[in-house]
């Protein structure tokens, strides 16, 4: 009966019965009563006893027989999971029968009893729905704390950290109070608090806050030991988590933790090295839970990993290396022996742990004996198993999952055969660990006594603040009395920023319109009004982005419902920032998630939204670009031309006029096809001409994350500068050739022109630089140098959005016309739109822009400064005064070469139309090493592929890791050494998805400034199906053996435009630096009793390997589910309507002061709570630093000037409370 589909089907049926009973309550039939009695009688006596005790609320967690006993009899050594598994079918039948007779107390007890077992089967979401249904039907039904905490665990696994934090903090603050549950004694409340503290520690571990996580796990151990009978299971779990944290913790943090006067763990005193302490902790953890195989497996896996890592470290004496490797070998073998060959494994967590043990053992054999045939065979088997595990996780049917589970365990058995795993003698046949592990059980775990309640008091500020942020009453209370103390219950789910109370939301999801009305009628008027306001605020988002309202299910985002046109969002004012974030609002796909959109058929939005009539320009433009018949294009283009004169497609004169999907998603570059100065208006999809030159209408379509230029509905050619589609593969070889694409189009007079794209691009007078300007791009880049010819060409070609006269405003107040392109490219202060990108310094998109001239040799030249103009930063403006903070700027983060293109976009203030032409022969020049601008733009600035004289063989040698390289990486290397070692590795092609790879996991510690590697296996899965398209990178699911959370979800990111390895490592180093700064910032907030904490999601690197040769590189971070918002970019734009922005700007100010005036963290984006307080999770920062000028998004001095004079023009309350010192204008100009 342990079939997931069958279990899920019965639970779904139970939920449907509860939904019907919620609408009407019929009399209980005699047949139903008889069935209920029959089902109860069919249960084994042990299960009947457990159900009775659960109804009586005898314990908050279903206990194991051995959990609280020191002396055990043979019957105490059984595993409760085996008992539940054997009677699962009868329990499910009893659950359904209890619901039919409306015995919610009995049904709730059965849910409680099955909870842990079904969590192992990966069907907790369905069971939690039943628990909520029971509570909705009869709010007085007691729901066990274990079930409420399960909700928190599932939330952590699925990425809903805000929700999990609320549930846990509420239980801790309210002494475990939840709904109508009654505790039998005070020690049960301590147990619940200890478990909650433990899970909070796991959340901080997930966020990479190693020291803080270790403190919480230590606190949970204190709680378990405070009980009248110590909880051996809880202690075992906490010791295992603590050991896992020690693996990632720096030596500095470990020494600090070890020497802390309040931390009194005995094992810390016995070992000097954190990895040896971790290994010993795992040995104890396995011994404490010797009768539960999964607990033993997890503990010995961590022990083996610790010993393996220590054997590779520089601290391990050479003579002890083989000793520790043998101890690691023993640990992994113990784990593999927790299941017999042919024994069924049902859950993802256990399967993952077995593969990890097999891989760990393979790695140990490799270190001890080298790359033998057995090692190579075992490694291949582990890789196959990881691939099957990913398929297992995503398989829709239980039959497939059961077959895959058997195949995975068969592969594990083969690994055991290749590596000759033998069973060990054991006196206790029920125990899964050898007798040698049990000798440490008698030793003291703690020195001295610590008061658990005092420990909780130190965290009370955090728990209270989280509860205040999400304060709500039970959604089912008929009186909804607001003066009663708020306690978490199974339906109190108001913890997401983009949904209303999910009690109502979940009910709406499963019921008809009538049922929704009925449920709504049960709410108070105040709650109904509140719900309406919430719906009103989120209406725009809900049309374009639909997320599962059942916040307990591990669901991905659903596709948008295009049946409503997809353009309802366009009817909102540009200034209406409460309904959705501005950069998502303009596109019609409101941003509710951080990951970049792939596989997005934007044309569907355009086609189905083209019927809108409220804004004729948008509707007409949409049709013209996407699906207008050829015969109508000429007249349509004339109409659009007249409509678009004087109108900026980025910022309109009418606040209520918003850009169409085609304008924002189908941005076509202005393509001069020949020397006749023809240019294409990107937003309108038409060509404005001069001197009677031919005109061409182009359209741009997006499919699977790649852009394609469409000349007609059937004639297309692909823009090869963007990432290829999922189905297509990058050109083979180290450097792929640029394919020659045929084009075929007709001008407006019906004359057909043909040729190759390469011929067009490399014409005698103009170089074709195909790239689209995406207002939702991520980050702008910067260099101190001027512009390369191709980059100037790219920027100039992208700029003509409104066909208006271009002028350049300089800090000294001078104005220069843009048609001076014969000698260079002048740029100006852009009138900005709400999608402000993070820009690069090269083109200087914003106020302090410089003219870049190009010499005859094709080299870029920075313009000469005018007299009186400072090179340090802008000091004066056109109107003679510093502008106020800009709120309407392009809001995404801009990359190198994009800033210039954005700068050259039309100004809203332009009053006349004047097309301009690029005639400089410099634009047709190739790069100095013979590359065309096309191929230069198709790679990174730092692409080693363009280095003259570098051969493929040299690149291949640089990518191959020698044994000495691997040894150093495993021991830990500094950032500069790593970058130097990877310097000549060239530009890697895109990673191959849908398969498993060998990999090196590299973690960076800002405190030690070391990168430490770990061998692993990773499966690169499907692209994320999300609604926010990123400019730079694609995001896809990954699952790797050494991820922090076995059941957690992780996302990999790779650049769409292939780049060198330096970019990936610099990105992670920057994010972990921001995390280091924010940790110190949080301490200052806590000291001042400010109820907010900011976290940066940790990021790591996975180097994809094939026989020790680097084949790819991705960055990886935990998946966070919730509403994704962007608070600022890396130049001047900031969204002050979010309360979180106040804290973010204060954090940026703090980072400047904490770094001794050298760094400012900017480009704030992530997940915030509804009121912007409590908890803020951020990702993908940029840092303006005076030290690292090799990063193109780092503006250095000018970036710091932007921050203090535009984004953070005056200090806020947080700055004052933290006593931050504000630099003067002169200081920021001379940083």
From Swiss-Prot:
Disruption phenotype: Mice show defects in motor coordination. The cerebellar architecture, Purkinje cell morphology and electrophysiology of the Purkinje cells is apparently not affected. Mice display impaired ability to initiate an innate immune response in response to ADP-D-glycero-beta-D-manno-heptose (ADP-Heptose): mice injected with ADP-Heptose show no increase in cytokine production. Residues 524-537 have a biased composition (Basic and acidic residues). It catalyses: L-seryl-[protein] + ATP = O-phospho-L-seryl-[protein] + ADP + H(+); L-threonyl-[protein] + ATP = O-phospho-L-threonyl-[protein] + ADP + H(+). GO terms for molecular function: ATP binding; monosaccharide binding; protein serine kinase activity; protein serine/threonine kinase activity. Residues 1003-1223 form the Alpha-type protein kinase domain. It comes from Mus musculus (Mouse). ADP-D-glycero-beta-D-manno-heptose binds at residues 61, 67, 116, 150-153, 231, 233, 236-237, 295. This is Alpha-protein kinase 1. Its EC number is 2.7.11.1. Residues 700-714 have a biased composition (Low complexity). The lineage of its organism: Eukaryota, Metazoa, Chordata, Craniata, Vertebrata. Residues 775-784 have a biased composition (Acidic residues). GO terms for cellular component: centrosome; cytosol; photoreceptor connecting cilium; spindle pole. The keyword Amino-acid biosynthesis does not apply. Keywords: Cell projection, Cytoplasm, Cytoskeleton, Immunity, Innate immunity, Kinase, Serine/threonine-protein kinase, Transferase.
